[in-house]
């Protein structure tokens, strides 16, 4: 199984692809799509969409996982992240890729074994899980890999119970 994880954002959208062969996970590729500050929002969303479509075409994931929207105190941030999520969901749906969504606490629980893990703990667990020499950068890319790892661990159980 080849899983694409996406950490949505309009300034930076992290993405990471892992492959699971039996019980072994390996990194396929990781990165981040960025848009310039000051770029009009519709153009930012189009740039993210086109970038994500190119990644999907190049890496051919079987499945995808996107972090669910977390409503913090900043409503404007939540709205723009929601728009970026919509772009990601659209690109994945158009490519016919099944999409799963995970709450941040579920990702932390799956990757670090603790739903309250902090960012540094998560990044270190991503590094260790994939046998990497360093933590992927930027942070959004490491977050996207955590989402992909969460899905790679969770997908067999979902399939066993017929959840799609």
Swiss-Prot record:
It comes from the Bacteria. The active site is at 7, 67, 140. One of its GO terms (molecular function) is DNA binding. Its main location: cytoplasm. Mg(2+) 2 binds at residue 67. It is found in: Cytoplasm. Binds 2 Mg(2+) ion per subunit. It is an enzyme of class 3 (hydrolase). CDD domains: RuvC (cd16962). Its cofactor is Mg(2+). One of its GO terms (biological process) is DNA recombination. It catalyses: Endonucleolytic cleavage at a junction such as a reciprocal single-stranded crossover between two homologous DNA duplexes (Holliday junction). Its EC number is 3.1.21.10. Keywords: Cytoplasm, DNA damage, DNA recombination, DNA repair, DNA-binding, Endonuclease, Hydrolase, Magnesium, Metal-binding, Nuclease. Mg(2+) 1 binds at residues 7, 140. PROSITE patterns: RUVC (PS01321). GO terms for cellular component: cytoplasm; Holliday junction resolvase complex. Belongs to the RuvC family. The RuvA-RuvB-RuvC complex processes Holliday junction (HJ) DNA during genetic recombination and DNA repair. Endonuclease that resolves HJ intermediates. Cleaves cruciform DNA by making single-stranded nicks across the HJ at symmetrical positions within the homologous arms, yielding a 5'-phosphate and a 3'-hydroxyl group; requires a central core of homology in the junction. The consensus cleavage sequence is 5'-(A/T)TT(C/G)-3'. Cleavage occurs on the 3'-side of the TT dinucleotide at the point of strand exchange. Homodimer which binds Holliday junction (HJ) DNA. The HJ becomes 2-fold symmetrical on binding to RuvC with unstacked arms; it has a different conformation from HJ DNA in complex with RuvA. In the full resolvosome a probable DNA-RuvA(4)-RuvB(12)-RuvC(2) complex forms which resolves the HJ. HAMAP family: RuvC. This is Crossover junction endodeoxyribonuclease RuvC.
């Amino acid at each position: 199984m080849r899983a694409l994880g996406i950490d949505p954002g309009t300034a930076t959208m992290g993405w990471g692809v892992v492959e699971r062969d039996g019980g072994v996970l390996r990194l396929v590729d990781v990165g981040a799509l960025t848009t310039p500050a000051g770029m009009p929002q519709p153009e930012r969303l189009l740039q993210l969409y086109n970038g994500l479509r190119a990644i999907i075409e190049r890496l051919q994931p079987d499945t995808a996982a996107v972090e669910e929207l977390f409503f913090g105190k900043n409503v404007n941030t939540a709205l723009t992240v929601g728009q970026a999520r919509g772009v990601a969901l659209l690109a994945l749906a158009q490519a016919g890729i099944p999409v799963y969504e995970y709450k941040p606490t579920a990702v932390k629980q799956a990757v670090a074994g603790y739903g309250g893990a902090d960012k540094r703990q998560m990044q270190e667990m991503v590094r260790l899980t994939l046998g990497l020499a360093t933590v992927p950068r930027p942070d959004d890319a490491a977050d996207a890999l955590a989402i992909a790892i969460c899905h790679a661990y969770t997908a067999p159980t979902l399939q066993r119970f017929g959840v799609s």
